[in-house]
C-alpha cells in the first residue's frame, strides 16, 4: 500500500511539473516593470495604436490574434518585456 501511495505521489509531481513556473512581465504601456508568476507556459505582448497613442499590454499565455493588434508570444521567463 505504501508503494502504491508513493508511486501516485511521484506520478502527480511529474505530471503537474511542480518544480517550474513561468514568470511574465505584466506592466501596461510605459508603467514600471512588474512580474507575475503564470500557470501557462508562455507570455505575450500586444501592441496597438488608439487615440491615446501606442498602447502595450503584457501578460501570461498567448491570446488569439486580432486585426490591427501586433501580438508577440514567447516561452522564456520575462521574454515579453
From Swiss-Prot:
Q: Does the keyword Chloroplast apply?
A: no
Is RNA-binding among the key words of this record?
A: no
Q: List the disulfide bonds.
A: 24-43, 38-60, 62-73, 74-79
**CDD domains listed in its UniProt record:** TFP_snake_toxin
- Cellular localisation: Secreted
Signal sequence residues: 1-21
Q: Which Pfam families match?
A: Toxin_cobra-type
| InterPro entries xref list | Snake_3FTx, Snake_toxin-like_sf, Snake_toxin_con_site, Toxin_cobra-type
**Keywords, sorted A to Z:** Acetylcholine receptor inhibiting toxin, Disulfide bond, Ion channel impairing toxin, Neurotoxin, Postsynaptic neurotoxin, Secreted, Signal, Toxin
Q: Name one GO cellular component term.
A: extracellular region
Q: What is its main location?
A: secreted
Functionally, this protein is described as follows: Binds to muscle nicotinic acetylcholine receptor (nAChR) and inhibit acetylcholine from binding to the receptor, thereby impairing neuromuscular transmission.
**What is this protein's name?**
Short neurotoxin 1
Amino acid at each position: 500500500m505504501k508503494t502504491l501511495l508513493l508511486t501516485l505521489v511521484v506520478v502527480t509531481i511529474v505530471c503537474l511539473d511542480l518544480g517550474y513556473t513561468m514568470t511574465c512581465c505584466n506592466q501596461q504601456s510605459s508603467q514600471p516593470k512588474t512580474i507575475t508568476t503564470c500557470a501557462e507556459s508562455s507570455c505575450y505582448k500586444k501592441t496597438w495604436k488608439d487615440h491615446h497613442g501606442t498602447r502595450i499590454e503584457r501578460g501570461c499565455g498567448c491570446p488569439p490574434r486580432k486585426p490591427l493588434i501586433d501580438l508577440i508570444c514567447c516561452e522564456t521567463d520575462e521574454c515579453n518585456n
